[in-house]
Design a protein with these regions (language model features):
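Aliphatic-rich helix starts adjacent to a transmembrane/signal segment
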Residues: 5, 30-51
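Acidic glycine-/aspartate-rich tracts in secreted/extracellular proteins
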Residues: 112, 215-218, 282-285, 405-407, ...
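N-terminal single-pass transmembrane signal-anchor helix
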Residues: 4-32
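N-terminal module-boundary/linker segments of secreted carbohydrate-active enzymes
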Residues: 132-259
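Alpha-helix exit/C-cap motif
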Residues: 52-71, 342-347, 374, 405-408
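Short aromatic-cysteine micro-motif
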Residues: 199-206, 240-395, 531
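Periplasmic/extracellular, small/polar-rich flexible segments of pilin-like filament-forming proteins
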Residues: 56-135
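C-terminal, surface-exposed recognition/capping segments
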Residues: 331-334, 352, 360-373, 377-379, ...
Length: 532
């Protein structure tokens, strides 16, 4: 007689093992997830505790524009030593109070990121983009806020005139106070990583840019509001406008009233309406292979127009910008000049508009006023379009500047230059009727402004020479401050602006002259980035 076993058979044992394995497979991620969620929530509570600690300190730090704390490796570097924080090991980020005492923050460790903006709190593992993303927006700009390329760094300046990383969520510009938005592009391998508030080493900067917001303008009489004459003009009436708004008025008052506003031409790029443009703060510097935009060094000259056009591209390409850098057009020069001749530039009151000072440096040193001055000195800022360090420099004197503005031939094609030896380097008709064919093709139409000779004229009439009508932004201001105004004609089909130091009183914001487009030791150029 056999006794029946009460143990598991091999098959049953294997089945149990399989079931347990399945349970483990299912349960382990759940348990791991619970543990991770607990750690994540613990990090969030610790971050909230750090923020809470700043509330015992903010009363002593608050300014009219708010205040921002910096959290670095678990320590708030600008926190009163009597205020203690805990559970903050390895945390970094920023805590920002606005002027009303409302707090936003972005705090991260090696694994988690918590961001609070308004009433919204997000918790993620995206630590590479753990920043407060609500940038400062000046209401007067009507939505035309600075658009930064991901490789650009917003800056302000110390009292000593040294650029430092701006807190984009605080007031880092104010057009109402004639403080224009500035940004820099760093070299590809800077000496360090820069954080908010850090002063930036000049050797780490490849280029400086200034934001020109989209606007429309109109003019009272022939000399602006409160203007008396060309030698003592008044201010241009402008207002900042949304990208969706476009005005095509005659840019002139009606019976003393501000009407007929016109959107400045620079804010149209092909079919695209622009919210603004970034303009090189100084004339282009460096070399043809490695162009820069920097103060205190000689400007890049002795290039024809086509070479300058190609060189301008390299500022963006060499420094890995996603937005394109390009050579400035005539309309873009005008955009800077008109903004400067407004209440947001060099006209701080209804009765005073000061002329941009001449850069009379005979060595073409950028950012100078009188020889020997630097752009960030008391004397140097007189050559700025804002009378302070935030403006654009070298627009009166220094070197003259080629712009992308060209006379069309009778077939509607851009001319090349004077003769086969002296020309822009672009293909096109020459003054003697022959053609240059071994040069570069001109870029798309949106990259240059064009002029035409109408009727029996032998040179461009600025009242009829732009699309059959007025050359807005140029013709209204001819001769202001006694700046030189010279003709564009078949022998001199390319436009240059600003004048060079040797033009003396004839140089200035409103100086314009046709010339041959060739390489010249007295002529530089300027780069722009067209904001999205």
């Amino acid at each position: 007689m056999f006794i029946k076993s009460k143990g598991f058979t091999l098959i049953e044992l294997l089945a149990v093992i399989v079931i347990l394995a399945i349970i483990a497979v299912i349960a382990t991620p759940i348990i791991t997830g619970i543990i991770e969620d607990t750690k994540k929530e613990s990090f969030k509570r610790s971050a909230e505790g750090v923020v809470e600690a700043t509330k015992f300190d903010i009363a002593d730090k608050m300014t009219d524009s708010g205040y921002t704390y910096t959290l670095s490796d678990g320590k708030i570097v600008n926190l009163n030593e009597n205020v203690k924080i805990s559970n903050s090991k390895g945390m970094n980020g920023s805590i920002k109070y606005n002027k009303d005492g409302e707090v936003s923050y972005a705090i991260y460790n090696d694994k988690w990121c918590v961001i609070k903006e308004g009433n919204d709190v997000t918790l993620s593992n995206n630590i590479d983009k753990c920043v407060i993303v609500n940038p400062y927006k000046e209401e007067i700009l009507n939505g035309t806020y600075p658009v930064l390329d991901e490789k650009m760094i917003a800056i302000t300046y110390t009292e000593a005139g040294i650029p430092k990383v701006a807190d984009e969520s605080s007031e880092w510009y104010s057009y109402a106070s004639r403080k224009w938005a500035n940004a820099v592009v760093l070299v590809n391998n800077p000496s360090k990583t820069y954080n908010v508030g850090d002063e930036i080493e000049e050797s780490d900067i490849a280029a400086y840019f200034v934001w020109i917001p989209r606007y429309e303008y109109t003019l009272k009489g022939n000399f602006g509001v409160n203007g008396e004459s060309k030698t003592n003009p008044g201010y241009v009436d402008i207002r900042f406008t949304k990208v969706s708004e476009e005005s095509n008025g005659t840019a002139s008052y009606t019976e003393g009233n501000p009407t007929n506003y016109r959107t400045q031409d620079a804010f149209k790029f092909g079919e695209e309406n622009l919210s603004g443009i970034w303009v090189g703060k100084f004339e282009t510097t460096g070399t043809a292979d490695n162009p820069t935009i920097k103060p205190g060094i000689t400007s890049l000259r002795k290039q024809n127009v086509s070479t300058q056009f190609e060189t301008a591209k390299k500022i963006g390409i060499n420094n890995s910008l996603s937005l394109e850098t390009s050579m400035m057009k005539n309309s873009e020069w005008n955009a800077v000049a008109i903004l400067s001749q407004s209440l947001y530039g060099r006209c701080p009151s209804d009765s005073t508009c000061l002329e941009v000072a001449l850069n009379n440096n005979t060595n073409f040193i950028t950012g100078s006023a009188t020889a020997g001055s630097t752009y960030n000195s008391e004397e140097g800022v007189k050559a700025s379009t804002t009378m302070n360090i935030t403006g654009v420099y070298d627009m009166n004197g220094g070197a003259s500047e080629w712009v992308m503005g060209v006379l069309l031939d009778s077939d509607g094609k851009p001319r090349s230059g004077y003769n086969i030896s002296i020309n822009s380097g672009f293909n096109g008709k020459l003054e003697d009727g022959t053609e240059k064919t071994d040069g570069l093709a001109l870029p798309e139409r949106k990259y240059y402004d064009s002029f035409t000779i109408t009727g029996e004229n032998t040179k461009v009439d600025l009242m009829t020479g732009c699309n059959g009508g007025k050359c807005y932004g140029t013709v209204e201001f001819g001769g202001w401050y006694d700046d030189g105004s010279y003709s564009i004609n078949p022998a001199n089909p390319w436009l240059r602006r600003g004048g060079y130091y040797g033009n003396g009183a004839r140089a200035g914001l409103w100086f314009f002259e046709g010339s041959d487009g060739g390489a010249d030791g007295f002529i530089s150029f300027r780069a722009v980035i067209r904001g999205a």
